[in-house]
Amino acid sequence: MSRLSCRVWLLGAVCFISGLVAPAQTQRSIEPGPNRGANEGEGPFARLIIRGATMIDGTGAPPVGPVDIVVENNRIVEVRSVGFAKSPIRDANRPKNATREIDATGMYVLPGFVDCHAHIGGVAQGTPAEYVYKLWMAHGVTTIREPGSFNGVDWVLRERERSAKNEIVAPRIFAYVSPGLGWDKGALRTPELAREYVRWAKEKGVDGFKIIGDGPIYDPEIMAAFLDEARRLNLGSTTHLAQMGVARMNVLQAARLGLRSMEHWYGLPEALFDNRTVQDYPLDYNYSDESHRFGQAGRLWKQAALPGSKKWNDVMDELLKLEFTLDPTFTIYEASRDLTRAMRAEWHDRYTLPSLWRFYQPSREAHGSYWFYWTTQDEIEWKNNYRLWMAFINEYKNRGGRVTTGSDSGFIYKLYGFDYIRELELLQEAGFHPLEVVRSATMYGAQLLHAPKGKPLEFGIIRPGLLADLIIVPENPLANLKVLYGTGAIRLNDQTNQVERVGGIKYTIKDGIVYDARKLLADVERMVDAAKKKQQGAGN
């Protein structure tokens, strides 16, 4: 795809969701996931027993083991302690009659991860769904929230149902659509149209909404109607409160109207302003120049109220009272504070498609490719930005607020799956204990997705009666989150004095179906190799 055609697609999406053009334009989408092959995943089994594991249950409780976990079909039916640490296991007390066993002695088992900001590829990036799904599953992501559903409402709903039936190798999908996407009645320019669209989307079967854009949706009366109708119909809501609308509606104002969660940081520092009402934009600022947009974003948090100030505490107190959820997506902006690190991440060579790599390159026409002349000062500003942003997120968690994990990969040198794990590392950098990181990645993500429906958890913790979405890891992820990367972690073997790779998820289990995580990564590597050979052939 040419840069021009990439830009046309992106502009179409942005204009569509912001109400600048009527949404009757043709929806473009990527190739859906292929049907699951006979050799892709084993099970579900009548009685699968995972034996001898150390369990991290996702609630924040410490590890415990050894345990045997019994799964029947797609549900956990029993978690049984079978001994004591560093002591022999007595077989007499172990569950029996397995139709399939996994020996997880010395390994760790966790709930499947929830990526609360996970786009299923994009036409501009040239990423087929299979590529994206397998990268997620290889990194333990068994559930995603698709914020925006820009492949089209019907497309995402079809993929959601195919995943629910395990017809494809994919995480379970929660479809959040953007206001106005998919219908033929124009932009949401009145409260009545906003309510009508919510009812239309509910009838289609969506799970919730991601509010994004710069059009009338930010008008307080339209936002209020939209969010009120969404809550009335038990639909979720989140937002990317972009700069073009945040002067009218910051995060706190939206939360008061019923918004349930937020993405990134947009609208939060603006809610913390105590000596200004708009960001200190340079007078030659142009939002459509992404070097301006992201360069100045890195100078935003220092314009907000200081940590511990009355304004800081007042905003945090009210968001906590409203039971508001923060989904920070630290990872997607990380290149802004260290461009070279993001560009040279070791997984790019083997696992990044050539089309995606081209999309990442500096360009005024591709979203998130704003490295026109990125400077040392830009990176310093972003490092300082992160310190304040992370301070708010960590304190919000410490005071009882829910913080979830989302990656927003597919932009800014961030790769699906790999950079979900990087998000976990960045939460630890912000001050989270690794058990708090795992809780955000599992139970809290599940709570965010279940709460609007008023239903109890179906996944997100390891507990009898819940869905069998599990991860089995050979190494201790609490000691080093890097062992969750598909490339593993580097360690010097003191017995051999040789450097070795350790870790990488061994098995990802979704709905009781056991997937070999390394095989999923090998499938991705073959896709990348084939794309590179095709590109080389075209150049000859």
Question: Each predicted region: which residue ranges?
Answer:
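Active-site neighborhoods of metal-dependent hydrolases
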Residues: 200-211, 268-430, 528-531, 536-540
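C-terminal helical cap
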Residues: 53, 371-374, 380, 386, ...
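Active-site gating/metal-coordination segments in enzymes
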Residues: 178-233, 252, 261, 289-306
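Bacterial N-terminal signal peptides
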Residues: 9-19
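Histidine-rich, glycine-flanked metal-binding segment
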Residues: 30-36, 40-44, 55, 61-110
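Divalent metal-dependent hydrolysis catalytic cores, especially in the metallo-beta-lactamase
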Residues: 132-153, 170-181, 202-216, 235-238, ...
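Metal-associated gating/positioning segment near the N- to mid-region
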Residues: 93-167, 186-192, 246-254, 275-276
